[in-house]
Each structure stands twice: as C-alpha cells, then as structure tokens.
Amino acid sequence: MAFKKRFTPRRKFCRFCADKDLPINYKRPDILRDFVTERGKIIARRITGTCAHHQRLLTTEIKRARQMALLFYTSTHSSDVLKKSSL
C-alpha cells in the first residue's frame, strides 16, 4: 500500500520584516503594485505573507497612492472599455 506524502506549504515571510531598508511609501508605486490585483483589489496578507503591522501600513499607503493618482483604482478605465467596444 502506497502512502501519499502530505503537502507542506512553504512558510511565507514578510518582505518588509526581512528587508528593513525596503520602504512602504505611497511614492513607490512599483513596490505597491505587487500587493494589488489586476482589478485593483488589495491582496490579503494570507496570500502575500506580510505581517499584520506591515499589511496595515500597505493598505493605507495603497489608498494614499490611489488618491494621488499614482495607482489606479482599476486596471482599465471605463472610457477605455467604451472605446474598444465601439470599434
């Protein structure tokens, strides 16, 4: 009788705890884009692996970057969709 090995997922770690020099700042949208889906939703910490403290900071900075128009609320705007459908 063959026994199946149990799958043990790799332990997720917080990128910001591991690298203290990596800033969480609204002025760095290239870093913030890693934590936002294509549709503009903020990815949960159980998926990204960030700790609770840094997840709270990430959420506020992503929202701040959206208000400053450094990040989009969604990936495509409704005007782009209307242009494509009219062609």
UniProtKB/Swiss-Prot annotation:
PROSITE patterns in alphabetical order: RIBOSOMAL_S18
Example GO BP: translation
Subunit structure, as described in the record: Part of the 30S ribosomal subunit. Forms a tight heterodimer with protein bS6.
UniProt-listed PANTHER family: 30S RIBOSOMAL PROTEIN S18 (PTHR13479), SMALL RIBOSOMAL SUBUNIT PROTEIN BS18M (PTHR13479:SF40)
Pfam families the record matches: Ribosomal_S18
GO molecular function, one term: structural constituent of ribosome
Gene3D superfamilies in UniProt: Ribosomal protein S18
One cellular component term from this protein's GO annotations in UniProt: cytosolic small ribosomal subunit
Domain of life the protein comes from: Bacteria
Protein function: Binds as a heterodimer with protein bS6 to the central domain of the 16S rRNA, where it helps stabilize the platform of the 30S subunit.
InterPro entries the UniProt entry points to: Ribosomal_bS18 (IPR001648), Ribosomal_bS18_CS (IPR018275), Ribosomal_bS18_sf (IPR036870)
Entry keywords, A to Z: Ribonucleoprotein, Ribosomal protein, RNA-binding, rRNA-binding
SUPFAM superfamilies per UniProt: Ribosomal protein S18
Family label: Belongs to the bacterial ribosomal protein bS18 family.
Protein name in the entry: Small ribosomal subunit protein bS18
